[in-house]
């Protein structure tokens, strides 16, 4: 490499021995810059005709809105609208009586069915019966599903408790098993949901 004094003045960089012949002498840009013909902007630009806006714009007729708009007849709504005989009232159907109670009872039945199903899932009464071949902690479901089902039953029981108070007024709490339970009656059936 060079001399013995420890200074290396021969290295030019990685692969510098290969790039020397490719760049044509190693100077950039090649040739003269800027070109001798001229600078910026190129010849012929901007057009000799003028600037902005181009000739003939905007039209000589006027601005906005175009002539003939809006129609001379009037504003909004157009004449003849709404059609004769149109009733302008609420579009929602009108029901009198106790229609809301039927919807509440139907909703309560659906919620009770959901609680009933969750209760059976958490107590090991799945489709295979008993424990379904899994360990006791899985409660008849796939391994690891017991905690999720228990959390769901807790949520369902809270909802069911409020529904039962509103619809029947016969909710009661008992502590007969390891957890607290909720029972209530809808349509002469008693459902249990584990909290």
From Swiss-Prot:
Residues 163-175 have a biased composition (Basic and acidic residues). Residues 82-94 have a biased composition (Low complexity). Residues 23-103, 159-182 are annotated as: Disordered. It comes from the Eukaryota. Residues 47-77 have a biased composition (Gly residues). This is Glycine-rich protein A3.
């Amino acid at each position: 490499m060079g001399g013995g004094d420890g200074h290396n003045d021969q290295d030019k960089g990685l692969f510098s021995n290969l790039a020397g012949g490719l760049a044509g002498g190693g100077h950039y840009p090649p040739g003269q810059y800027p070109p001798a013909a001229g600078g910026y902007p190129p010849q012929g630009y901007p057009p000799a005709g003028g600037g902005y806006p181009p000739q003939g714009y905007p039209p000589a007729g006027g601005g906005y809105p175009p002539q003939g708009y809006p129609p001379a007849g009037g504003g909004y709504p157009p004449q003849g609208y709404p059609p004769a005989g149109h009733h302008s009232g609420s579009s929602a159907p009108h029901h009198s009586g106790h229609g809301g109670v039927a919807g509440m009872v139907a909703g309560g039945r659906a919620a009770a069915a959901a609680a009933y199903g969750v209760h059976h899932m958490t107590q090991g009464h799945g489709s295979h019966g008993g424990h379904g071949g899994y360990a006791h902690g899985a409660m008849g479901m796939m391994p690891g599903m017991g905690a999720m089902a228990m959390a769901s039953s807790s949520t369902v029981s809270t909802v069911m408790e409020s529904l039962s108070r509103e619809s029947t007024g016969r909710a009661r709490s008992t502590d007969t098993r390891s957890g607290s339970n909720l029972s209530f009656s809808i349509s002469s059936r008693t459902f249990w949901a584990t909290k």
